[in-house]
């Protein structure tokens, strides 16, 4: 009987640790384009856990790219970029922005979590944001159109 109780307690602790550990930070997206996975850096976020909540304000997306030394994934003009999360964001909350050289941003239209990259050659920095029941989060990535 004692062994059963210890085993049950160990299972509860393990499951609880996995559950709470996986909910401490926002989910990270998987971004793919032309069979390549794009490296993504965490941007600003606010997230609520069971015990605490935190908001973290990050530097600008171009500075995040420099800080994390992210290299652009080289893609074809007008390639389709797919954004997926292991935990689905709230409906109609996924947004993308293209960062311009003057520090301004413009909306990057998404259709079913797919973004079409520009046809002009160049390096493009994008930020993506979404909301969940536990909070909101932003992410940054860079691509190069050849």
Region spans (language model):
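Mature extracytoplasmic domains of secretory-pathway proteins
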Residues: 47-104
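Edge beta-strands of extracellular beta-sandwich domains
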Residues: 29, 136-146
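Short beta-strand segments within Ig-like beta-sandwich modules, predominantly Fibronectin type-III
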Residues: 104-111
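Surface-exposed, short loops/turns at beta-strand junctions within beta-sandwich domains
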Residues: 115-125, 133
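Surface-exposed coil/turn segments at beta-strand junctions on protein surfaces, enriched
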Residues: 74-76, 110, 119-121
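N-terminal export/targeting and maturation segments
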Residues: 15-57
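Hydrophobic membrane-insertion alpha-helices, especially the h-region
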Residues: 5-19
């Amino acid at each position: 009987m004692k062994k059963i109780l210890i085993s049950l307690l160990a299972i509860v602790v393990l499951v609880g640790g996995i559950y709470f550990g996986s909910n401490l930070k926002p989910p990270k997206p998987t971004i793919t384009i032309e069979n390549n996975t794009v490296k993504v850096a965490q941007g600003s976020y606010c997230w609520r856990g069971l015990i605490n909540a935190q908001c973290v304000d990050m530097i600008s997306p171009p500075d995040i790219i420099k800080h994390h030394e992210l290299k652009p994934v080289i893609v074809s003009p007008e390639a389709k970029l797919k954004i997926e999360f292991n935990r689905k964001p709230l409906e109609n909350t996924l947004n993308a922005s293209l960062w311009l050289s003057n520090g301004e941003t413009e909306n990057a239209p998404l259709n079913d979590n797919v973004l079409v990259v520009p046809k002009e050659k160049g390096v493009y920095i994008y930020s993506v944001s979404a909301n969940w029941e536990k909070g909101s989060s932003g992410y940054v990535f860079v691509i190069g159109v050849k």
